[in-house]
Amino acid sequence: METYQNNHPAGKRELVFFLLCVFCGLFLTNVTLFGGFHLGFAIGVILSVVCAAGYLMKNGRKKSPYALTILALCLVIAGSFARSDDAFVKFVMVCFLLVAIPLGLAILAGKNRRDPKAAASLADAGFVFFGLSFGELPASTKGLTKAFRESGTLGRKGGAVLLGLGFSVPVLLILIPLLMGADAAFEGLLDKLPAFDLAEFLGTVVFGTCLSFLLYTRGAALRFYEDAPRAPKDRKGLPALTLNTLLVSVVFVYCVYLVSQLAYFTGGFAGLLPEDYTLAEYARRGFFEMAALCAVNLGIMIFSLSLCRDTAPKSTRFLCLFIGLVTVFLVATASAKMLLYIGSYGLTRLRVLTQVIMVFLAVVTVLVSVWLFVPRLPYMKAVVLVALAMGAVVSWVDVDTFVARYNTHAYLSGKMEQIDMAHMGSLGDGAIPYIDQLAKEAEDPMVRQMAEDLVTHHGYHKAEDWRSWNYVNHKAQKYAPEEIIRDGVAVEISPDSRGRSLYLVVGMEGVTEIEVSTPTTSGGCIHADGSPLKKGEKLWLEQADSLAGVSIIARDKYGEILWMMDFPKNEDSEHYVIDDWIVVIE
């Protein structure tokens, strides 16, 4: 019997929840689009999850500890965005949040369609994200509109005002530019107002409004949506004999491989090198291949168990158990070999992340292996919680900081005879404090010099405002030279014998010409012989004595634009920071 509701009833509680969703949607959109995945994003995600969970918890249902734990770990992961500056890890964590938050909310509301103990339960996240958030948008909007009409005079007037504000935005966007072009006095009045970013306003309103309705629809649908009962489907799959044939062939190959490589495996555990191999060759070879093998083995186990036509017989389970034990053994062996390599050559991002993945695969393999003979084990719940917990740890630790700290301490303590400064330089802001430590404490003068150069020429990015702030980046700023010029030209105004004059300081290699245009004049700076301008070279320009309305373009010898900047007509601040350029007025 179809029990699907054509609309979701809404009362005062839904109206309050909708207003909270509007705030969260606009806030999260603004801080993400114009601040990145940093402090603002962390606050926005935490607020949206807390609002949704609070709305769904007051429904008289027994609270699921599993769902609450998922959401709590999501909050911990979201908080890490205010600490870490690792773009790759943040991307992975965003993917985690996109799956875990809908899954946790669905289980909390009791609207999960699949058993949380099964691997298929992850599909509920997709159902909530697409099926409810988008599919139930008309129903939730209809219920919300009806609630506004029935909420009394204040509710009707409030809805009318919101609708009027929505219509006024595009109208004003047309009127204001036309009035500015028609009247100089009106344009001058607006120029004196605080800076207003039209693109930011439009982006926030348009995308924030869309996100607000999606957040509300997700919450309302999780509370009111009733899924039509589905008839149980006959289990289809492959005969056990077919799967056992596949598993036996895999087991046979592993048996032969283990026998042929036994000396190498035991050597890895004992710390003894096979003859004719150096430490680097022995420890490095095969580590990443073993990581891939672990993933393939786990896939074979899940494939065989999920495609078995009937309940997997003991023969299939024992074959899967053998593959699981081999997987754990491969993880232990690869880890032992990698520890040998790390002891002499230190850590890298790739080694750390690969090791984390292998440990996770080993944990999943153990859980699946136990589940083979203990079917009531909620292995999928454990897998989800372990994945989120490991993700939270990796995010908060910050891989660049962890790698740099280990390598620096191991090198300075004598545990490592050499340190890869090229890799240290490739790390992010988290490595700067430890590179600075090398510059001060390393005995090798070459290492000290390389460390000093890395600290001096590191690509420092100062947060434009609180939205783009994160702890690792903030900490690295303390080690930046007082006057750091990166990838461009610093613009300064200093008094001299002729009064205030504008001069440029070339801050990058390859600049051949710098064009400067003011509201009244234009000119350029080039060498007579066409040779590139030297980094640090000062070029005096007498046609400007302020930044107001100044346009600067730096070109290479081919005429390609390396950097350009147009300063506002009312720019008179004493410290102007834009992207990678630092502009100072003295």
Task: Say what each PLM segment does.
Residues 392-417:
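Hydrophobic alpha-helical transmembrane segments in integral membrane proteins
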Residues 1-54:
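N-terminal signal-anchor module of multipass membrane proteins
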Residues 2-16, 57-66, 112-117, 139-159, ...:
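Juxtamembrane membrane-water interface segments of multi-pass membrane proteins
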Residues 251, 377-400:
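Internal/C-terminal transmembrane anchor helices
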Residues 30-34, 43-184, 208, 212-224:
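Transmembrane-helix bundle segments that line or gate the permeation/cavity pathway
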Residues 425-586:
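Extracytosolic and intramembrane catalytic regions of membrane-associated proteins
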Residues 192-207, 275-295, 347-358:
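Short aromatic-rich membrane-water interface segments that cap or initiate transmembrane helices
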Residues 27-42, 59-63, 82-94, 188-198, ...:
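Membrane-helix interface and helix-disruption motif detector
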